[in-house]
Amino acid sequence: MTTITEKRLTFAFPEDYYVTKYDEWEHYKIFQNSCNLRNKIDTNEKGKNGINQSVDDDNGSSGVDIIALHESTLWLIEIKDYYRLGLEPNAQSIDEKLSDLPYLIARKIRDSLAGLVSAKFKAEKQEEKDFSRLALDCNEIKIVLHIEMPSIRSKLYPSSSDLANLLKDKFKLSEFTKNFANCYAEPIFTNISHINNPQLRNVPWSVSTGTEQKLSSEQQRLIHNPMTTIYNTLTRQKEPFAPIDPKNVRMYVCGMTVYDYCHLGHARVMVVFDMIARWLRECGYPLTYVRNITDIDDKIIARAAENGETIGELTARFIQAMHEDADALGVLRPDIEPKATENIPQMIAMIETLIQNGKAYPAANGDVYYAVREFSAYGQLSGKSLDDLRAGERVEVDGFKRDPLDFVLWKAAKAGEPAWESPWGNGRPGWHIECSAMSENLFGNTFDIHGGGADLQFPHHENEIAQSVGATGHTCGHHHAQTHHGQSIASHVKYWLHNGFIRVDGEKMSKSLGNFFTIREVLKQYDPEVVRFFILRAHYRSPLNYSDAHLDDAKGALTRLYTTLKNTPAAEFDLSENVNDYTRRFYAAMNDDFGTVEAVAVLFELAGEVNKTNDAQLAGCLKALGGIIGLLQRDPTEFLQGGAASDGLSNEEIEDLIARRKQARADKNWAESDRIRDLLNEHKIILEDNAGGTTWRRG
């Protein structure tokens, strides 16, 4: 087999084909230069054969990429690789080339034939002379235009049928092939990187991409995701995601205060930012994801005293419980989970710097406070001025503060409470300083994304900005953006992301209203993946209303997707090597501020197509797309027969009842068969009788 490599494509020809890369011939280069003067003279004129001589004339003569000989047939092969359009900064738009393409190809054919005639008599290399002689002795010419279509499809790029019609209308070969008995011309349209069978129709060779031509992770990111947009709470608008350092994207999320079991609000934070982390990595960004653990706090101290256990015992127990809940929900562990108690020296150092910078002051009671009015940009995240905050917010009355809005950075020690040594006496850090110190310790003065629940926007995240910028003076560029009060934005974080609240039957979830649910309580009734799916069906910034009816609906919807995968087992599907309309729309949805609502809708459209076609490749696509956001990765039967045990029947009991029903049917005991079916229905066990037997799933 003879192989010819043209850029990223490898053409493999049968052994009896005589093949050459014509544009690498020595004589081709000489012939091209000799034609250069003629072409400059003819610039902007139309030749006798109707070819626009202005096209590409600066290069002199031009030839096709590959010439092949087989018996009495001459193959002229021109390759147009539009695959990388949109991937490379200087890539020309396909629109700019379309109108000239027929003339360009016709000219290449003319010049190739003329070059072969010249080489037959004038080539210095004997093999070029011999090849030309054999080529010109052929009595049939076959011309193939091999077009690699763009990876990024849109209305800006024509379909292959559009190109075919254009070539059919304008690609006239007769003037150049009068001396050949037969002439055959056909454009071949492919996207070799995304087809499973490299053998093309009507041609004897195959085409593939060599391993050395694999796209980089950055190019793969651009294929699916030319621009991610994120809603920035700070600027109150969607912005293109342009990380400070694309090779080192950094995201910090405020984690849990570990004094109790995690509730549904925590579940939403876990799942939402797990989804965001997964997506950024899918786009090719090297991401470091940090989610902190607050393991010292007033509530922790009070709960430990109430339980009669040490703070260390309490926090260790609930950290383990938090991890168990997160694992159940399919949440990947953050790269780093710093604990507040392990970063006390960093907090003390930042407080010292704030005092030195005139942004904080020690009080007579041993506390240290942040002087809010010393930070002119305070209120930018919440959209409130200092006067608004003073008038509208409840502030702690404290005779040691200079201003009621000032907040505590360091708390003086109290009897029986844990304490650390500091320049201001023994004590412990305030809540807000923890995140500023830990994020600076891990990420430096600035980083890309800071996330958390909407309830943290004020005062916690507002205070973080004041602390971090007040200590370092470093801010991220926000394109000269301003708050609605007119001051310039000053933040150490480029993008602030906040997920919406969870409401229960339309009311805010709270212990006082008796509508407070822990993750563990919910998982007793619903499969963890159902809860994850329920969270992802809503946009992360929207309020999410929790109710049994909504969870039941999510369960039914996820069951439909898994039923599709059960009926049509998924084939292996590599998203980096396969692009279709579903993948494009899924990526476009996620690309638009992590639009899981639209992305999930694409999954259901795709499932509908799988149900109609039983296409294993499309089923593989469904599973692969679901996997991007942490869904549909389980064995379908395991999901359908698993779930919570609230129906009161174990899998073994269900299988036993089905076996007894089967025997009753064999004995024609229809009453017993119906009784067992009714019993299973009462327990929400759905039976499906088919030629292969009876299958079941939990309803």
From Swiss-Prot:
GO biological process: cysteinyl-tRNA aminoacylation
Motif 'HIGH' region, chain ranges: 256-266
UniProt subcellular location: Cytoplasm
Binding annotation for Zn(2+): 254, 435, 460, 464
GO CC annotation terms, alphabetical: cytosol
Catalyses which reaction(s): tRNA(Cys) + L-cysteine + ATP = L-cysteinyl-tRNA(Cys) + AMP + diphosphate
Gene3D superfamilies (alphabetical): Cysteine-tRNA ligase, C-terminal anti-codon recognition domain (1.20.120.1910), HUPs (3.40.50.620)
Binding site for ATP: 511
Renumbered residue ranges of the record's region Unknown: 1-226
Superkingdom of origin: Bacteria
Record text on subunit structure and interactions: Monomer.
Protein name listed in UniProt: Cysteine--tRNA ligase
